[in-house]
Amino acid sequence: MTELPLEAYYDLTQLTDISISPSGDRVAFVTTEFEATEETTHSSLWVVPTDGSRDPHRLTQFGSASEPAWSPDGSRLAFLASRDEPIAQRVGWTDRGDDPETDSTDEEPSDAEAAGDDEPTQQVWLFDLERGGDAYQLTDREDGVASFDWEPDGTRLVVGARDPTDEEREYVERRREGGPIETTRLQHKLDGVGWTDDVTEYLFVVDVADGSIDRLDDAYGGGAFQDLTGLEPAWGPTGRIAFTSCRHENPDDTMKRDVYTIEPDGTDLRRLTDGEYNHGQPTWCDDGSLGFTRSDPENWYEPTEAVVYDGESTTSLTEDLDRTIARTATLNWVDEALYTLLADHSQTRLVRATVDEGVDWCFESRGSDRALLGLDVSDDGSTAALALSHPQDGHDVYVVDVDELESSRAIDRTADLPTDDPETLARLTDLNADLRRQCSMPDVRRVEWESDGWTIEGICYADPELDLESGDHPLVVAIHGGPLSYDEPIFSFAHAALTSRGYVVLRPNYRGGTSFGREFANELYGQWGTTEVADVVAGVEELIGRGWVDPDRVFGYGFSYGGISQGYLVTQTDIFAAAAPEHGIYDPFSCYGTGDSHNWFESEFGLPWEDADRYERVSAIRDVDSLTTPLLITAGGEDWRCPPSQSEQLYVAAKKQGVDAKLIVYPDEHHNIGDPDRAIHRLREILAWYEAYDPAVEDA
């Protein structure tokens, strides 16, 4: 077999956003690529016809691009971007015939420039696809734009943007210049944001023709994670604008969010929901009803539901199905039917639901050998665009006729969801052809095993040239994060790097994951370090029992809750020859209040000064005297989901026990490994760590 070079990571193309035109004739999508010479990441916006008559056309190449959205008539394409001068010549220009090379040195500085920040801020940009030419910048908000939506007639946009007072602006400027951090907020940190401030996000209405902008004073945000979720504005057919916000007495002390609507002139604010749930993704139907998601703010293991508000009451479309809306799902209306994505066992399924029937059928994404990552349905209801990830092909854009979807058979909602495999998908892209030519991509198998009376599923990856039955192969157990997540067959550079070097990779869907129903997920609620440990150990024993892997050559890694699980596994068992807990939490008691997860911890374990025993029971550090496994521990220097101090504690505890350990901290990195050089470094270090403690390598 041919090893995948780690430097080939620079050839990886990731698919992040898809948006289908109103008539279904084109798909806009965003890819993320890496620049080796500059060690940077670029996001590019593309358009491709759905009939496959032309190859994808790249509209942007440098800077960033995200969240493309077509105007209602399909003539313009709006998106969010942070772009440097001199591309941004004008703000809200009205004469599209002017020379785009016009010198802007005599113009007044923009709000973003006046703010004194050298980095470009994220703004709304527009392509006029009928006239052609480069995109032009529509907004010029000082702190950028977080989200937007089109007015149904296409003449205006509603945008969500921060709007600091003079005092708040002065503080933000002092912070940018290295001044002291000052906060009175309970949610004092947020991963990916850093230390939070008091600046409020509002909705603004922007005229597309001249760029004029008006703030809706009553449409403002609030809540612990507001800086991440945004206001999620949606402009409806009745003229009203829907958005989400938390208006509780102490919005940082709850995960509850409500859905509001308001007139575009800022009058007649209404709250549609009861203040008891976490609501999100408001999406209008043509008849004026409003769909959105609803989840339990106190128990995050409960399924997220799709619900509809008809002007008087709210009805759940998925409550009886015992499955959760997938985390990557959007809500899409066709007439009075809602199309969305559900998590079901080890895969994501496209389903249709109505108020009268609930979920009445399911379209399976051409077999269960790939992951369905995204969905968008054209406004005319003719065509659906899908983002699919195949372990051997990569991430790509597909389309399917909605009429073909609706030919799928009805399902018995008391039984398992069926599998339909119509040959109707049309592939529009081949984003990772160059990468695939460098080695064989892994084969995928689904495996099952028993654990405490439960049937557990896992996804197993191996090189197609590997003879699994020979039984002497090294195994890597890769544990998903969340834990409110799940694994499904997916394209992964890390999987390919490992399998091309002879490793078998197992990704177990342990109890606590969200794709097997309410009872399965709640097995882990408040019980960290119990059920998932049993499920992982049983999965390893299953592969050993099948004769696929060498019991002395079992290794592990996991990121976020996967790292947390690694901490439990190495302090409770000795199944690993070496392990790599990444960006994890190993003592929730000392972690409480140092990151952004105080509401999460309180919902599962209570308050540490009131429930110290519960925190003690879920601390991996308490069992560190049993640790013998060599550990490669990683952390992000600015990770406020799983703070780096947690990795330091585990590292020092391991060294005190005389266990081989290495700590890697990525400066300025949050709960992620973003830069390509760091992603390559991470994989190189993990591979070297495994090799150093592989008995077969030692014998050789």
Task: Indicate where each model-derived feature is located.
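Cap/lid segment of the alpha/beta-hydrolase catalytic domain
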Residues: D421-T424, T429-D552, F559, C591-W600
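Multi-bladed beta-propeller domains
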Residues: M1-T13, V48-S66, D84, T105, ...
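Residue-level recognition of a conserved intra-blade site in WD40 beta-propeller repeats
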Residues: I20, W70, W150, W235, ...
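Hydrophobic beta-strand positions that form the internal "hydrophobic ladder"
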Residues: G24-V27, G74-A78, L157-V158, I241-F243, ...
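Beta-strand-rich domains and repeat architectures in extracellular enzymes and scaffolds
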Residues: E7-S44
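Predominantly five- to eight-bladed beta-propeller fold
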Residues: R90-Q122, R162-A209, I213, R257, ...
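Short glycine/acidic-enriched loop and turn motifs that connect beta-strands
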Residues: E33-T37, R83-A88, D163-E167, T196, ...
